[in-house]
Design a protein with these regions (language model features):
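FAD-site-proximal beta/loop scaffold in flavoenzymes
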Residues: 128-144, 227-304
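C-terminal catalytic lobe of FAD-dependent flavoproteins
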Residues: 226-252, 270, 325-362
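Glycine-rich Rossmann-fold phosphate-binding loop(s) that bind the pyrophosphate
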Residues: 12-13, 150-153, 278
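Glycine-rich phosphate/pyrophosphate-binding beta-alpha loops
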Residues: 278-286, 319, 349-354
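Glycine-rich flavin
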Residues: 2-143, 171, 176-180, 185-187, ...
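Beta1/beta-strand and adjacent pyrophosphate-binding region of the FAD-binding site
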Residues: 143-155
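N-terminal Rossmann-like FAD-binding beta1-loop-alpha1 element of flavoenzymes
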Residues: 1-9, 155-165
Length: 362
């Protein structure tokens, strides 16, 4: 719209998608509440007298909702100010230039697919009751006394951090060799050390076998014979693309395990149809989708923008301690460049700001 084009935005839910309503924003609100709880517990060392009386989840929920509501209203106002026509309903591709929604056909010279993702589970493990996804975890009005988290990636690590700060006993089950396994091994090991110090238990190289639930809790078994009991089991094994039943394959778009395959310019190879965000293989990050949306808009406008590789996109896990990275891991760099790679480490424990905040740094 900013580039002078007429735009219709079709959305089956609220504009803002997963990030605003069920992902980044509510999770970060919880993380800030958790950080505040830790600050109260540690306040005496800074000369501040305070008492920690527990977590009021009803108030945490109100705080979360107020943040989401403010951003949602701002986004609605932004779309209105740009004269973007917002159509509520699930669209379905009818052909290379037509989307059907609410019984109406809408035609456009260009179509951008951005249908997002959903919380995945694993075969044989159904979400329900005490077995929850991040969607249900963000709506809980109580703090579990204990939780098992299946998955040691971004989602699992952030919820582990929140619940531990809220007072829960937390155990993470991860099939890969390390927590945050996609990061540099040195970072993963430092994070594991920090989580041990916080009292967060974890089992890596451990594969899930089964889970049952009853009024007393959820009971989890792993393939190596371990058993875990908790109030809830959070399934945090990643997110899957929302592409099924939307007509993508019928018009000739190539899917791989549900993901839309594009070229480096995010074109699907069909007509003037592009795809962005979580439905495109790669990092499932809101700012990646945002960047891709800008790229496609400029591409459609004939501005010939420079294509961006996922390797250049920053990645952050907002646990405690936080992790941030960009570019290759050391392992990836050595595989590509061999002995020409030089590694330099600087321990932030010696940084003045770290000393003031009384954080160890990594």
């Amino acid at each position: 719209a900013q580039l002078g084009m007429k735009v219709a935005l079709i959305d089956g839910d609220k504009v803002g998608g997963t990030c605003l309503h069920r992902g980044c924003i509510p999770t970060k609100a919880y993380l800030h509440a958790a950080e505040t709880a830790e600050a109260v517990r540690e306040s005496a060392r800074f000369g501040v007298s305070s008492t920690f009386n527990g977590i009021d989840m009803a108030q945490v929920g109100k705080y979360r909702d107020s943040v989401i509501s403010g951003l949602y209203k701002g986004l609605q106002g932004l779309l209105k100010s740009r004269n973007v026509e917002v159509i509520s309903g699930w669209g379905r591709l009818a052909d290379a230039n037509t989307i059907e929604v609410n019984g109406t056909s809408i035609r456009g010279r260009h179509i951008v697919l951005a249908t997002g993702s959903y919380s995945r589970s694993i075969p044989g493990l159904d979400i329900g009751g005490r077995i929850i996804s991040s969607d249900q975890a963000l709506q809980m009005d109580w703090v579990p006394s204990s939780a098992v988290i299946l998955g040691g990636g971004v989602i699992g690590l952030e919820f582990a951090s929140v619940w531990r700060s809220f007072g829960a006993e937390v155990t993470i089950i991860e099939a890969l060799p390390h927590l945050a396994n996609n990061e540099d091994e040195a970072i993963s090991k430092q994070l594991e050390r920090a989580y041990r110090k916080r009292g967060i238990k974890f089992h890596t190289n451990t594969r899930f076998a089964s889970a049952t639930q009853d009024d007393g809790g959820v009971h989890v078994a792993t393939e190596d014979g371990k058993a875990f009991d908790a109030d809830v089991l959070l399934v945090a094994v990643g997110r899957g693309p929302v592409t099924e039943g939307l007509g993508y394959e019928q018009v000739g778009i190539t899917l791989d395990r549900g993901f839309v395959i594009t070229d480096e310019r995010l074109h699907t190879g069909v007509g003037n149809i592009y795809a962005v965000g979580d439905i495109v293989p790669g990092l499932q990050l809101a700012h990646r989708g945002f960047m891709q949306g800008i790229f496609v808009a400029e591409e459609i406008a004939g501005m010939n923008p420079v294509a961006q590789a996922d390797i250049n996109i920053p990645r952050v896990t907002f646990c405690e301690p936080e992790i941030a990275s960009v570019g290759m891991t050391e392992k990836q760099a050595r595989e590509k460049f061999g002995d020409r790679v030089r590694t330099v480490e600087y321990n932030l424990a010696g940084n003045g700001k770290s000393s003031i905040l009384a954080t160890s740094g990594i």
